[in-house]
Amino acid sequence: MWQTNEVAGKLIDEGTEVEIIGVKSTGDLSLGGNLSADVGQFVKSVDEKLLSGEVDIAIHSSKDVPVDYDNRISILGYLERGPTSDIILFSYKAEGSKKLNEVINSSVSHDLETILDTFPKGGRIGTSSVRRQSFFLSKRDDVVPLAIRGRVETRIERLLQGRVEGIILAEAGLHRLSLLDALPKGSSEINAMRISSEDWPTAPGQGAIVVHCLKDRLGELSWVNKRLNDYSTEVSVGEERRILQSLGGGCKTPVGVECVNGESRGYMAPENWREEYVSGNSFQLLPIDKYGITPQPENQAVPDDRGNPGHSSKLVSTLNSERMGNKLRNMGIEVLNTPVIELSEIKNNWPEFHLDVTIPRNEWPILILTSPFASRCASMMVEEIPDLGKIQWLAIGSGTARSCFRHGNPASICANASNSKELENYIKENIPSNVNLLIPRSSVGNNNMANNLKTAGFTVNSWVGYENSRKNVEFDEMNAQDVLLISSPSSAKSWDSNQLPVPDTVLCMGLTTKTEIQNIERFNNTEVIVLDGPVTESISQWWSENRK
């Protein structure tokens, strides 16, 4: 609404009578992570008022307007562009950072490498922008991306709540709130850094307010252009949008490009950047110029499926994680993925869900996801139950959060919990009890967490969302010095029922899995070790201490 008030104020100063008509966009009516599902969702609802004749002009942030848009609508003009940089806000005192207000009121920028050096390993970064996601993850693939939606004030509150270690916001929005003294309580204590535009070019049109009108009324409303339009902004934003269009871009295309004094430069993420990230492979940003030329990325090395067989022992894993396997192989650990469980969604069990958008958004239900497969099922069910995609998704840990990201529906919250008890405690400590919880579970899972949350005052809807069944497997490539990773109690049972060989050492995920293993006679002479922390990092540390 600030943008509309800014335009209205300038017209009123020129003696024009103005009536402001507020419109809720479809983008405003979602807290889900899939911001790119509908290109232009922040614009369409407003411009529909133009097409219906209810308003004469419509006001937007230029970066939200698709380059291929309704040809019945034209750009009437741009206000003078504000700051174009992005600012990263931290939940901690990052080395070299300053208080947010000090950063806003200065012109000091930091190169991206300096900023990345301050960000914790495995930290959570909050942004729904594919440009910001891909640019950050191209340098730090250990980081977990989370979707932080809503107004700038809401995103800052999420940071203050400790949901993420950092959020990335447009300087223009922060600058406006600072001028209005409207930053949330506690913002004065937030540390931040401005990201250098040399390393981090802006979204096309960022920092610019654009005015739309009907194409057939351009002549009639030309006086508005004369009173409002800033020619320099029109030229720079127009060039940035031209380059974006030449790249086939929109909200779904991770492009950063900035035009200054006729010179354009920027970067674009490769088409498969999301797949590379979730698979544990690195990817490089592609430089672009005013011609929109994007050199093809070099063929990236794909780890051998078996890793490096020169070592005397290997890891045999029931956790069929491509990312973990690739990461460990790149560290020189031979990995054989040997899943012994079949998982399949049970579509008919998923309940109908219709979101009541009239209730406050901080009371909207939250979908709780306890495994990567639960996130995969939820992503599939969004097609059947669209309102699931509008609410926040809470992932038990980084693996589940990355699975959400892989399937195009980033989680909004990552509990960093190692088991259901830790997840239960996280929910009790961080989620208000008036928020309804939706919890799909496995056919072999119990309802203990759901019942405990009900006892704590939550309204919980839990159902069997996917089938867990034993997979028939033949495997005889195990040596005594090899290491077996068992990911769940059901995997332990299936390994036993398949009568598969057992090495001297078993690594497992969670105390419940360890208890199940110790109850199986086949594992009686085996050392069982519970991994502590993120799985890949824990295995890497254990391997370096015990197998090298």
Positions of the model-derived regions?
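Signature of uroporphyrinogen-III synthase
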Residues: 292-548
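Hydrophobic alpha-helical packing residues
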Residues: 7, 11-15, 129, 136, ...
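Short, structured active-site "lid" loops
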Residues: 32-60, 354-374
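A conserved helix-loop-strand patch within extracytoplasmic ligand-binding domains
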Residues: 63, 71-142, 419-422, 427-431
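Small-molecule-sensing regulatory modules
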Residues: 1-37, 43, 62, 68, ...
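Short, hydrophobic alpha-helical packing/hinge segments within bilobed ligand-binding/sensory domains
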Residues: 46-47, 155-156, 423
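Short, high-confidence coil segments that cap the C-terminus of an alpha-helix
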Residues: 52-55, 164, 252, 364, ...
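Hydrophobic residues within well-ordered alpha-helices
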Residues: 50, 159-160, 453
